[in-house]
């Protein structure tokens, strides 16, 4: 029996994008910083890292499809923060963003990591953006790095 898994190390020649929504920027800026830190710590070349900003989480899938379809990137780390309010808006945005991101990843068969927070309140978002619960941006980039490595291994 063989176990095949990715490594948490970049080769240094991977072209990666961090796609981040600006809405709830107090949270998404911290997620983005965590992802950038992870990329650098695990052998990424900053010159091969692009940061792409969109207004909100609903726009993430549209631009993700553009990035993946461009052929310029080996993978994309998607970040955002959708915080529940008093209307059903949260449910619609979180569902459509999630479905759209998954659809784009499968359509292009390329590594995409999901670092979009969906929380009930701002406190939960803060906890997941670098305090009690770690930094989910860092974790999302870790996932992308492992996926990139695994795809390389599976190529042979």
Swiss-Prot record:
What biological-process GO terms show up in the record?
Answer: riboflavin biosynthetic process
Q: In which pathway does it act?
A: Cofactor biosynthesis; riboflavin biosynthesis; riboflavin from 2-hydroxy-3-oxobutyl phosphate and 5-amino-6-(D-ribitylamino)uracil: step 1/2
Cite the binding residues for (2S)-2-hydroxy-3-oxobutyl phosphate: 86-87, 128
One example GO MF annotation: 6,7-dimethyl-8-ribityllumazine synthase activity
Q: Which EC number(s) does UniProt give?
A: 2.5.1.78
Which keywords are on file for this protein? Riboflavin biosynthesis, Transferase
Gene source species: Helicobacter pylori (strain P12)
HAMAP family from the xrefs? Answer: Lumazine_synth
Q: Which GO terms describe its cellular component?
A: cytosol; riboflavin synthase complex
The active-site annotation reads: 89
Q: What does this chain do? A: Catalyzes the formation of 6,7-dimethyl-8-ribityllumazine by condensation of 5-amino-6-(D-ribitylamino)uracil with 3,4-dihydroxy-2-butanone 4-phosphate. This is the penultimate step in the biosynthesis of riboflavin.
Q: What is this protein called?
A: 6,7-dimethyl-8-ribityllumazine synthase
């Amino acid at each position: 029996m063989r176990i095949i898994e990715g490594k948490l190390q970049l080769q240094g020649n991977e072209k990666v994008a961090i796609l981040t929504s600006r809405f709830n920027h107090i949270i998404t800026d911290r997620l983005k910083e965590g992802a950038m830190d992870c990329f650098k710590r695990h052998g990424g070349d900053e010159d091969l890292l692009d940061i792409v900003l969109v207004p909100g989480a609903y726009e993430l899938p549209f631009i993700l499809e553009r990035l993946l379809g461009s052929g310029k990137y080996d993978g994309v780390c998607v970040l955002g923060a959708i915080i529940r309010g008093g209307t059903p808006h949260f449910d619609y945005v979180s569902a459509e963003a999630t479905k759209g991101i998954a659809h784009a990843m499968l359509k292009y068969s390329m590594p995409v990591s999901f670092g979009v927070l969906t929380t009930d309140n701002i406190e939960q978002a803060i906890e997941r953006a670098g305090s009690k619960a770690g930094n989910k941006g860092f974790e999302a980039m870790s996932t992308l790095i492992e996926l990139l490595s695994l795809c390389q291994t599976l190529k042979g």
